[in-house]
């Protein structure tokens, strides 16, 4: 999922309150994938309704978004469009991993190994078209705006921040920086304790903010060189150079200046290198969008979540009330400007 340059970035711990009154462009695909991975039963089974349809994403989207807007955050979800042709290899590899993980999950369940079952179940998660359409509808009736990107959601989210239509991008991946996002927030969808795979150890998952300029200054490079580092390590569009991690890539780029000089020096080749860079420097994005928050529709929320998907009516009503209260507070803040 994206490029592995996290060790090079300057991360700062923040609180939800630090994002109050800020517009956050949320990488929808990334966030839904998190919900599908995390919101599971002990044996790894996702939440489902009486028809066997997965509802983990709906649960995460409703309750976490309610918490965000309650904290004064203004989320706008950005959905992926058609992936670039150069991403086909990565998508095929992800499909193979999901299928293999699903088989291992079933075997672990049959053996009664719940820890292994949960681990493999998480890796088998898939955001399909039904999940996307249900998520968009839920956001609509929650009064939360969403935008359809023509291509990569992270590129569109970065574009919105650069246009000052949003204050930061929310994503677990680091690709947003390659697309030019000035500020990225991580762990917005889930904070708290997380168990390390295969170990009886729990770590704190805290909200992080990363500033692109701060990172570039600390590393002594520019954004173009950061893109070169990512390509050396590997991106969704290329495999990267053999035995080159982020720290080695940084040294190589600082020594030689750019990736063309690096591959010349090493006698290597990266297929379609200039086309890969072009995907980051000139991504396919749109200005045809509107960001507008509305009021939640309690009746439609109850019908969709409770009647159709077997959610607890009491919990849905409480979440709707939280969304309404936040919507009222948002309107009151707007009124103060006039």
From Swiss-Prot:
<keyword id="KW-0540">Nuclease</keyword>
<dbReference type="InterPro" id="IPR006085">
    <property type="entry name" value="XPG_DNA_repair_N"/>
</dbReference>
<dbReference type="InterPro" id="IPR023426">
    <property type="entry name" value="Flap_endonuc"/>
</dbReference>
<keyword id="KW-0269">Exonuclease</keyword>
<keyword id="KW-0378">Hydrolase</keyword>
<dbReference type="Pfam" id="PF00752">
    <property type="entry name" value="XPG_N"/>
</dbReference>
<feature type="binding site">
    <location>
        <position position="173"/>
    </location>
    <ligand>
        <name>Mg(2+) 2</name>
    </ligand>
</feature>
<feature type="binding site">
    <location>
        <position position="175"/>
    </location>
    <ligand>
        <name>Mg(2+) 2</name>
    </ligand>
</feature>
<comment type="subunit">
    <text>Interacts with PCNA. PCNA stimulates the nuclease activity without altering cleavage specificity.</text>
</comment>
<dbReference type="GO" id="GO:0003677">
    <property type="term" value="F:DNA binding"/>
</dbReference>
<dbReference type="GO" id="GO:0017108">
    <property type="term" value="F:5'-flap endonuclease activity"/>
</dbReference>
<feature type="region of interest" description="I-domain">
    <location>
        <begin position="116"/>
        <end position="257"/>
    </location>
</feature>
<keyword id="KW-0460">Magnesium</keyword>
<dbReference type="InterPro" id="IPR006084">
    <property type="entry name" value="XPG/Rad2"/>
</dbReference>
<keyword id="KW-0227">DNA damage</keyword>
<feature type="binding site">
    <location>
        <position position="27"/>
    </location>
    <ligand>
        <name>Mg(2+) 1</name>
    </ligand>
</feature>
<feature type="binding site">
    <location>
        <position position="154"/>
    </location>
    <ligand>
        <name>Mg(2+) 1</name>
    </ligand>
</feature>
<feature type="binding site">
    <location>
        <position position="152"/>
    </location>
    <ligand>
        <name>Mg(2+) 1</name>
    </ligand>
</feature>
<dbReference type="InterPro" id="IPR019973">
    <property type="entry name" value="Flap_endonuc_arc"/>
</dbReference>
<dbReference type="InterPro" id="IPR019974">
    <property type="entry name" value="XPG_CS"/>
</dbReference>
<dbReference type="InterPro" id="IPR036279">
    <property type="entry name" value="5-3_exonuclease_C_sf"/>
</dbReference>
<comment type="function">
    <text>Structure-specific nuclease with 5'-flap endonuclease and 5'-3' exonuclease activities involved in DNA replication and repair. During DNA replication, cleaves the 5'-overhanging flap structure that is generated by displacement synthesis when DNA polymerase encounters the 5'-end of a downstream Okazaki fragment. Binds the unpaired 3'-DNA end and kinks the DNA to facilitate 5' cleavage specificity. Cleaves one nucleotide into the double-stranded DNA from the junction in flap DNA, leaving a nick for ligation. Also involved in the base excision repair (BER) pathway.</text>
</comment>
<dbReference type="Pfam" id="PF00867">
    <property type="entry name" value="XPG_I"/>
</dbReference>
<keyword id="KW-0479">Metal-binding</keyword>
<keyword id="KW-0255">Endonuclease</keyword>
<protein>
    <recommendedName>
        <fullName>Flap endonuclease 1</fullName>
        <ecNumber>3.1.-.-</ecNumber>
    </recommendedName>
</protein>
<dbReference type="GO" id="GO:0000287">
    <property type="term" value="F:magnesium ion binding"/>
</dbReference>
<keyword id="KW-0234">DNA repair</keyword>
<feature type="binding site">
    <location>
        <position position="236"/>
    </location>
    <ligand>
        <name>Mg(2+) 2</name>
    </ligand>
</feature>
<dbReference type="GO" id="GO:0043137">
    <property type="term" value="P:DNA replication, removal of RNA primer"/>
</dbReference>
<dbReference type="InterPro" id="IPR029060">
    <property type="entry name" value="PIN-like_dom_sf"/>
</dbReference>
<dbReference type="GO" id="GO:0008409">
    <property type="term" value="F:5'-3' exonuclease activity"/>
</dbReference>
<feature type="binding site">
    <location>
        <position position="80"/>
    </location>
    <ligand>
        <name>Mg(2+) 1</name>
    </ligand>
</feature>
<comment type="similarity">
    <text>Belongs to the XPG/RAD2 endonuclease family. FEN1 subfamily.</text>
</comment>
<dbReference type="InterPro" id="IPR006086">
    <property type="entry name" value="XPG-I_dom"/>
</dbReference>
<dbReference type="InterPro" id="IPR008918">
    <property type="entry name" value="HhH2"/>
</dbReference>
<feature type="region of interest" description="N-domain">
    <location>
        <begin position="1"/>
        <end position="98"/>
    </location>
</feature>
<feature type="region of interest" description="Interaction with PCNA">
    <location>
        <begin position="330"/>
        <end position="338"/>
    </location>
</feature>
<keyword id="KW-0235">DNA replication</keyword>
<dbReference type="GO" id="GO:0006281">
    <property type="term" value="P:DNA repair"/>
</dbReference>
């Amino acid at each position: 999922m994206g490029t592995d340059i996290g060790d090079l970035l300057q991360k700062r711990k923040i609180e939800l309150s630090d994002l109050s009154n800020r517009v956050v462009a949320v990488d929808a695909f990334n966030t839904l994938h998190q919900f599908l991975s995390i919101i599971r039963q002990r044996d790894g089974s996702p939440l489902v309704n009486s028809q066997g349809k997965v509802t983990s994403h709906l649960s995460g989207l409703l309750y976490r978004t309610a918490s965000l807007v309650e904290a004064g955050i203004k989320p706008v979800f950005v959905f992926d469009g058609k992936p670039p042709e150069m991403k086909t290899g990565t998508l095929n590899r992800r499909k193979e991993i999901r299928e293999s993980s699903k088989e291992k999950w079933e075997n672990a369940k049959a053996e009664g190994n719940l820890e292994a079952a949960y681990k493999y179940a998480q890796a088998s998660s898939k955001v399909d078209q039904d999940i996307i359409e249900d998520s968009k509808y839920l956001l609509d009736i929650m009064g939360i705006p969403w935008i359809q990107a023509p291509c990569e959601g992270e590129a569109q989210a970065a574009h919105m921040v650069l246009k000052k239509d949003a204050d930061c991008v929310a994503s677990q991946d680091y690709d947003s920086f390659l697309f030019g996002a000035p500020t990225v927030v991580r762990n917005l969808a889930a904070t708290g304790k997380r168990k390390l795979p295969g170990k009886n150890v729990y770590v704190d998952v805290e909200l992080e903010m990363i500033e692109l300029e701060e990172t570039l200054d600390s590393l002594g490079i520019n954004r173009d060189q950061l893109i070169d580092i990512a390509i050396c390590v590997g991106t969704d569009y290329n495999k990267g150079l053999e035995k080159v991690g982020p720290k080695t890539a940084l040294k190589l780029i600082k020594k030689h200046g750019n990736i063309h000089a690096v591959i010349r020096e090493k006698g290597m080749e990266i297929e379609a290198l200039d086309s890969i860079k072009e995907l980051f420097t000139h991504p396919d994005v749109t200005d045809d969008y509107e960001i507008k928050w509305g009021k939640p529709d309690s009746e439609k929320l109850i019908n969709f979540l409770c009647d159709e998907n077997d959610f607890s009516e009491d919990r849905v009503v409480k979440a709707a009330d939280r969304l309404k209260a936040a919507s009222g507070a948002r309107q009151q803040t707007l009124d103060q400007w006039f």
